[in-house]
Amino acid sequence: MKAVDVLISGRVQKVGYRAFTRKNALLLGIKGYVENMPDGKVHAVLEGDDHQIDKLLELLRQGPVVSQVRDIKVTEIERAGHQGFEVR
């Protein structure tokens, strides 16, 4: 099990990116949250199995059809024991 802090930049707000993240996180059994940032980026904290996290990160690099992901920064962090997956 691991936890990562993820910062996604590009055209990622007002394109369904948070809903896309939540849907795929729930399908993969990942806990945490996703939120819009004031600077136009999307921030997520993901907790789960290494393989599941890697799979979700692959999906986040693609994003929903109308998004344009420019960059993803991933930092490993300590797990906080999130319950479920929340859109903030």
From Swiss-Prot:
Its EC number is 3.6.1.7. Residues 3-88 form the Acylphosphatase-like domain. The keyword Hydrolase applies. The active site is at 18, 36. It catalyses: an acyl phosphate + H2O = a carboxylate + phosphate + H(+). One of its GO terms (molecular function) is acylphosphatase activity. Belongs to the acylphosphatase family. This is Acylphosphatase. It comes from Methanocella arvoryzae (strain DSM 22066 / NBRC 105507 / MRE50). The gene is acyP.
